[in-house]
């Protein structure tokens, strides 16, 4: 099959999904369908295209895309990039079964550790993962803000407990996104998928988790004395659980997180606290997507971020009191027991 004949779905074309679908289309792939339950977003993309605004570089483009709601799907896809929230994974994957070609695969880009859920429903041979290293915010029907620089965008892909036979196909598909922005490094092999997952999970648990319960940006969390101490503690809990799993953390932005932040001596802790604001400088204006969910009255996916660290820690006998507290507070906020406030930091013993 020619790559141009490959049928591709972006299932969950919110902020990140719209960016990926727009780039693949702009790069030259014509069989890319952007699928979302948001009917007004779908119609806007059908009428005027997908508009991507790169705030870091003050540039933008609009590209005509093929947008669908789930009810409008009629095709069977060779590759589905799963970009929804994890809370409904089983239901979503059961639905997608009928829309996969005989040897079709699902590549999940979700945060946390999502590949196992794909394998459970579809079988390990159809389960692939991608770690997406870019940020985006949904701002209106048909329009998305990209919070990363074009040349800084990356996607690392690999199979999950299978022979990785479709990794080459995924890399070729994603190379078209790279072509759209002259970024030859966009598509990359993930030689250590779980290491990359855990590195990103550690960052998300520390900063996205605390952003949910405090309402603060990542930069504010990394700057203020109490919050950055809690963030460092969460990062270390994630490192400890990953190590107990036998996972070697991948470098983040070229830096060895374990080496820079993992040391527990007084001097190494002091250095780590000094480095946190520097490390988060590029992401200082971000707030958690989970915070936005809660503000809109939705349940967030804290159980799949800090919650999965707590779950794995309990299974392996590794204490995770800080992650446990983030989960407790986030659910308390969802249920009206707590308010989103910086005062919630007082609940953390550090």
List where the protein language model places each region.
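Rossmann-like NAD(P)(H) cofactor-binding subdomain of soluble oxidoreductases
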Residues: 59-145
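Helix-loop-beta segment of a Rossmann-like dinucleotide-binding subdomain
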Residues: 100, 144-158, 211-221, 287-296
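NAD(P)+-binding Rossmann beta1-loop-alpha1 motif at the extreme N-terminus of oxidoreductases
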Residues: 1-58
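Active-site-proximal catalytic alpha-helix in oxidoreductases
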Residues: 194-222, 226-241
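Nucleotide donor/acceptor-binding cores
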Residues: 6, 78, 153
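Rossmann-fold dinucleotide-binding core
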Residues: 109-206, 211
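NAD(P)-dependent Rossmann-like dehydrogenase/reductase catalytic/cofactor-binding core
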Residues: 2-4, 232-350
């Amino acid at each position: 099959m020619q790559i141009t004949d490959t049928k591709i779905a972006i299932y969950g074309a919110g902020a990140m999904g719209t960016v990926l679908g727009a780039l693949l289309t702009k790069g030259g792939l014509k069989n890319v369908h952007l699928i979302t339950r948001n009917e007004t977003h779908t119609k806007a993309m059908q009428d005027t295209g997908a508009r991507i605004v790169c705030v870091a570089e003050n540039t933008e483009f609009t590209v005509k895309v093929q947008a669908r709601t789930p009810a409008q799907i009629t095709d069977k896809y060779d590759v589905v990039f799963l970009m929804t929230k994890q809370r409904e994974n089983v239901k979503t994957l059961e639905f997608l079964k009928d829309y996969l070609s005989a040897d079709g695969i699902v590549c999940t880009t979700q945060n946390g550790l999502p590949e196992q859920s794909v394998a459970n429903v579809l079988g390990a041979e159809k389960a692939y993962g991608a770690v997406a290293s870019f940020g985006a915010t949904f701002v209106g029907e048909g329009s998305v803000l990209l919070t990363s620089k074009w040349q800084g965008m990356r996607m690392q892909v690999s199979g999950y407990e299978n022979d990785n036979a479709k990794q080459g196909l995924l890399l070729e598909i994603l190379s078209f996104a790279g072509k759209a922005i002259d970024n030859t490094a966009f598509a990359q092999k993930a030689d250590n998928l779980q290491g990359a997952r855990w590195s990103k999970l550690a960052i998300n648990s520390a900063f996205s988790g605390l952003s949910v319960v405090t309402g603060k940006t990542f930069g504010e969390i990394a700057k203020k004395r109490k919050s950055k101490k809690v963030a460092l503690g969460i990062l270390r809990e994630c490192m400890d659980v990953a190590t107990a799993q036998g996972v070697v953390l991948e470098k983040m932005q070229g830096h060895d997180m374990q080496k820079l932040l993992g040391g527990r001596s007084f001097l190494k802790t002091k250095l780590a606290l000094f480095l946190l604001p520097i490390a988060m400088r590029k992401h200082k204006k971000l707030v958690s997507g989970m915070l936005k969910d809660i503000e809109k009255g939705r349940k967030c996916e804290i159980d799949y971020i800090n919650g999965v660290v707590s779950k794995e820690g309990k299974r392996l006998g590794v204490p995770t009191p800080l992650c446990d507290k983030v989960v407790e507070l986030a659910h308390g906020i969802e249920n009206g027991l707590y308010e989103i406030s910086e005062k919630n930091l007082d609940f953390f013993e550090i």
